[in-house]
Amino acid sequence: MDQKNFSKPLSLAKVQVTDAFWKKEMELVRTEVIPYQWNALNDNVPGAAPSFCMRNYRRAGEVEKERKAKGDKFVQIKYPLDTFETLPKDGKMDGRFYGFLFQDTDFTKWVEAVAYSLTQHPDPELEKTADEAIEAVCAAQREDGYLDTYYLINDQDMIFTNLKDNHELYCFGHLTEGAVAYYQATGKDRLLKAAERFADFIASKLGHGEGKKAGYPGHEIAEMALMRLYDLTGEQKYLDLAKYFIDERGTKPYYYDIERGLTCPEGEERYSYNQANRPVRQQDEVQGHSVRAVYLYSGMADVARATQDESLLKTCETLWNNMVHQKMYVTGGIGATHIGEAFSFNYDLPNDTAYAETCASIGLVFFARRMLEIQAKAEYADVMELALYNGVLSGMALDGKSFFYVNPLEVLPEACHKDERKFHVKPIRQKWFGCACCPPNLARTVSSVASYAYTENDTTLFVHLYMGGTVEGEKVKASITSEFPWDGHVSVTCESDTKEPYTFAFRIPGWCASYEKEIPKGAEVEEKDGYLYVTKVWAKGETIRLNFPMEIQFLASNPLIREDAGRVAVKRGPVVYCMEEADNGKNLHLTKLCVNGEKTAEAADELGEHFVRVTAEGRRMKLGDAEKQPLYHLYQKEEEEKTKLKLIPYYMWNNRGEGEMQVWIRACE
């Protein structure tokens, strides 16, 4: 593993986004999504599923206050731990925990989004709200560092007795990520100290050694959270704990058997749902719950980089290749089945029952960025870009007030309402979810999108994503002008002199067949792994100009993807397109796209959004008096009529009411 290839993300404080596209999304999160979600966390959104999140923190704080006051005389009122979700009965609540057992993370993801927003746009009132909420959270923490309201409220004697199912280490992970981000944004360490104390508690209870359990997370995220804590503090113990979780995972005897009193017959492998069916370095196929998987792989990449573990990196590369070449949707969505919110078998990518959870695409972005930190390869950045513009942004309405958990590639509303096999596919975005992992996850990702655009090392500034703004690296400052994702022209101006040769490395998008470049005189130019490296002693004001033409592309799938045979998907630049009923009428399944016909891309403004609409020649089968026709009849050539198909960006679908939608369209010559 060559450390010369390593790079690290720039601090968000060193990147200012002025980009027309992403600045708008970030402002939407700041002005609409963050306040809306704060109301949701406090159960103040009419018609939305309750969160109970802040109520649980306050209730846990009351329990801790009573425990401290009574000391040895404290006797906890205990409640059952046998439900994944607890709801009030007949609208009446008692002192128990309510919601999903991981409900704490609604807040910790929200506060992470707040932190990133404050970095770009200081807001004293928002910071005050976050500070007060942090006090409520920290008031619930035990003196020994434990902080998970599900057990603090219900039964503290049962802590760490069901790591597989009950998400304690998942809650720790999101607490830590939020705490690190908030400290970096504000300099305030109240939540950070709480996260460190919780991490120390975990290290004292889990691992190898007398009195410890050889356990590891059921839902991964603690691994990459510990690595963020390690990167911030330099404390070796956090790297050691992350490495332990990864190394121990999937070893036999299975810890999950031990903690639940089960045995595993010789030769049997299970727990693939948790990516714990075998040691991670022996895994060669992405399996199980898709979000858990990419969170684990992100942590593995972090540990591989920090420890220069070649075997772990090789595993990451193997799993990456299986995922993006055999199990990823054209939108950057992952996880094909609602059963277990999981990956299916290779090339099984159904469109109308797709799961493609918003959180899973976000996790894919995390994984891609971490692989880029080890070595800049355009494939990683291409997938990161694909997921961000499509599989991630589709999870949020244009007004920021409703959300998709699941992101299908084909929707017939009647089927969503009447076919139980598609109960998970919603034809309209929801105000909130009882299991609300996706909305705050999306908010924190959009707020921090600049951290995925650039990485740097001692010699090079890497530009992975193109967005307008300013960048202040350790050795160079630059301003970037970009109209992505609608136009491929990019200019990068050096805003400082360099005393020594320095390199800018620009990703050459995989969707671009050829590109144009205008390079200052005297520069050394090299292409490597899909990046254009430009090296020279820079003078302030020197500019690099690039143009990546965005042609309308009709994509075909691998022939082993059964559902997409004979169909095409439309893509322009990084943006995937879809047909909607609002533009093309009902019965979209009767339409065909003429791949050799005329096609146009035109700027449009609708629903407050500037975008590029694609129009293509098509044909539509005449429906006739179909309801009076026999169910089956002898084949005869279909009667068709010419039509113009109008397509919009996939992330924009379902912002004009309920209706049909298709990404993959039947093709004709």
For the regions a protein language model found, what residue spans apply to each?
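Low-complexity, Ser/Thr/Pro/Gly-enriched N-terminal "stalk/linker" regions
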Residues: M1-D106, D131-Y151
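Well-ordered alpha-helical scaffold segments within catalytic/enzyme domains
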Residues: W22, V111-P124, G173-K188, A222-E235, ...
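Beta-strand-rich binding/interaction modules
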Residues: K499-P520
